[in-house]
Swiss-Prot record:
The gene is ruvB. It comes from Marinomonas sp. (strain MWYL1). This is Holliday junction branch migration complex subunit RuvB. Its EC number is 3.6.4.-. Residues 185-255 are annotated as: Small ATPAse domain (RuvB-S). One of its GO terms (molecular function) is ATP binding.
């Protein structure tokens, strides 16, 4: 997958999972950014603990790399509960989920990543478990088949997804708490980079932290990945204190520019400016000019460029904006609209 090959991919790659686990915050007090989510979760968790009840079932959604798994583990730590982790694709049969549910203790948290990928059969098992803490299972086959109910201890289901729109309404409606994680601002990411640098044993000054943060596309996972590469350059160069210049040199070497664009992003923008004169252009034409398939453009390259305001979609096709010309120090055509 081309997305997995990009240094600025927000998807898990290489040893991201191992590194993320080592440096992720363990409590809400250490959780940086997402102020609305943090404030709400502090209240919900404190209230549940005061009542001596499990936290309401919680859905966390947002783009990859923003800390959904981190927040799920923080919830477990704050509630003093054990977190049992699985994912939607892993739960292939109803029996898989039943085995997990029957092994939960009171107050435990069941964390299901990629919950939008649960099959309908699994969801049917989940509904009574979430609502009534009961497990309905069928024993036997044919006319002799019968349903039995197994009482479950009160627990909290925490679901995480990058695609909340794919959740079925019955499942979505059973979550009492729904939290959306937003992209991080540069200030929050700078603080995250400084914290991660300390955990990694890297001496990074404020300017170095800022340089990594502003090229990280609003995503902590990307920031931590870029930080590791900056650490490599500093180590080989014999730099003890890493400042802006060392960080710039490392990130320029990785072809990640000041906007967080890599070579694919820049190639698409330059193609639209130089070959199509900045005019609206169809997806087929862009695909042919870039030599990339349409799915790669729509799913991998284009979303961030649109989000940052460098490309817009018009009835006549994709078009670069004034910001794209400014980014490359190109003069706007006289007839640019």
């Amino acid at each position: 997958m081309i997305e997995q090959d990009r240094i600025i991919s927000a998807e898990l790659k290489g040893n991201d999972r191992q590194v993320d686990r080592a440096i992720r915050p363990q409590a809400l007090a250490e959780y940086i950014g997402q102020p609305v989510v943090r404030e709400q979760m502090e209240i919900f968790i404190q209230a549940a603990r005061q009542r001596g009840e499990p936290l309401d079932h919680t859905l966390i959604f947002g783009p990859p790399g923003l800390g959904k798994t981190t927040l799920a583990n923080i919830i477990g730590n704050e509630m003093g509960a054990e977190v049992r982790t699985t994912s939607g694709p892993v739960l292939e049969r109803a029996g898989d989920l039943a085995a997990l549910l029957t092994n939960l203790n009171e107050g435990d948290i069941l964390f299901i990543d990629e919950i939008h990928r649960l099959s309908p059969a699994i969801e049917e098992v989940l509904y009574p478990a979430m609502e009534d803490y009961q497990l309905d299972i069928m024993i036997g086959e044919g006319p002799a088949a019968r349903s039995i109910k197994i009482e479950l201890p009160p627990f909290t289901l925490v679901g995480a997804t990058t695609r909340a729109g794919l959740l079925t309404s019955p499942l979505r409606d059973r979550f009492g708490i729904v939290q959306r994680l937003e992209f991080y601002d540069v200030e929050s990411l700078t603080t995250i980079v400084a914290r991660s640098a300390g955990k990694m044993g890297v001496e990074l000054d404020q300017s170095g932290c800022f340089e990594v943060a502003r090229r990280s596309r609003g995503t902590p996972r990307i920031a931590n990945r870029l930080l590791r590469r900056v650490r490599d350059v500093a180590q080989v160069s014999g730099e003890v204190l890493v400042g802006q210049k060392v960080a710039q040199r490392a990130l320029d070497m990785l072809s990640v520019d000041s906007q967080g664009f890599d070579h694919l992003d820049r190639r698409m923008l330059l193609t639209m400016i130089e070959k199509f004169d900045g005019r609206p252009v169809g997806l087929d034409s862009v695909s042919a000019a870039l030599g990339e398939d349409k799915d790669t453009i729509e799913d991998v390259i284009e979303p961030f460029l649109i989000q940052q305001g460098f490309i817009i979609r018009t009835p006549r096709g994709r078009q670069v904006t004034k910001r794209a010309y400014e980014h490359f120090n190109y003069q706007l055509p006289s007839d640019f609209k």
